[in-house]
Amino acid sequence: MKRQCKGSDVSKAVLVVAVLFFTVLRSNGQQIKPADSGYVPVDGNKVYYEVYGDGKPIILLHGAFFTIGMNWGQLIPELSKQRKVIAIELQGHGHTPYSDRKLTFPSLAADVEKVMDYLKIDSADVAGFSMGGSVAYQLTIQSPKRVRKLVIISSTYKSGGWRPEVTNAFKGFKPEFFTNFPFKAAYDAVAPDKTKWTKYLEQMIAFAGTPFDLGDANIAKITSPVLIISGDNDGLDKIELAKTYQLLGGGLSADLGPMPKSHLAIVPSQGHVSLMMQTKTLAGYLEDFLK
C-alpha cells in the first residue's frame, strides 16, 4: 500500500528546503562590491541590477526567493575576472520592488531585455538558476538573437521537469514557513518597502505552484549553444532532462559524428541548493563552455 502524503510531510519538505536556503545565505554572501548598480524602469515598476568586471557580458538570473548575493555571491568574483557580469534581481526579489503585476515567464524575460536595452547590451551569454533558468529559457525563446550562449543550472522549462515530490512541495509552501528563517532578515535588509513581505511571499508561492510549460517545440528551435548543469539528486526528473538535452541536439554518439554544440553536465552528490555552492566546479564548466 502506498503511503499517503500528509500535509505535515509537505511541511517538513519545505522546512528542509528553507534550512538549505539558510546554509546558502550564510555561505554565499557577496564577496565584492559592484562597479555599478541601479534601477531600470519596467511597466510602472523598476528592476534592480548590479555590474561587475569588464569583458564580454554575461547576465545572471537568480532562483525563486533568492537575491543576487545569496545565489551568485561566490561565483561573481570568479566570473568577473574576465567578464562583464550583469546580475539582475527579478520582480519582488531583493532590491526590486514588489509589484501587483501578474508574474509570468514572458514578463520576467521582457524585464531582462529592458535591462539589456538600458545598459546598451545587444546580446550576451545568459546563466540562470532554478526559476532564473526558466526565465533564461523564455528569454532565448522570445528573443533568440539576444542570447549568445545559455547556461541552465538545476532548472527546467516545464513543471513536469521536476520530480513529483518537488512539485508537491511547491504546492505546500506557506508564508509562515519563511518568516522564522533568514529570508525575512534578508528581505528587510534591502527591500524598498518592507511592508510588502507577505504579499511578495503570497505572489511567489502562487507562481511557484502554478503548472507551466514553455513548449517542447520552442526548446527544439533554440539555436544558441546550451549548457545544462544538474545535480544528480537536485529534484529534476532525469528522464525528462535527457529528453530536454535531445531536443537541444544532444544525447548522440559523438564517435559517429560531430560533438553537439550543447552540453550536459551531471554533478555527483549534489542537491538543488548545494549545487550552487560548488563554486570551483561551476566556474570551471562556465569557463570552458563560454570561451
Cite the ranges covered by each PLM segment:
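Active-site nucleophile elbow and catalytic-triad environment of alpha/beta-hydrolase enzymes
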Residues: 203-218
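Active-site loop/oxyanion-hole signature of alpha/beta-hydrolase fold enzymes
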Residues: 87-127, 276
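Conserved HGGG/HGGXW glycine-rich cap/lid loop of the alpha/beta-hydrolase fold
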Residues: 45-95
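Flexible "cap/lid" loop of the alpha/beta hydrolase fold
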Residues: 134-142, 148-184
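Conserved loop-alpha-helix segment in the C-terminal half of the alpha/beta-hydrolase fold
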Residues: 77, 232-270, 276
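Post-His helix in hydrolase/transferase enzymes
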Residues: 275-288
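Short beta-strand/loop motif that positions the catalytic acidic residue
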Residues: 222, 228-230
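Alpha/beta-hydrolase fold catalytic core
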Residues: 2-58, 82, 291
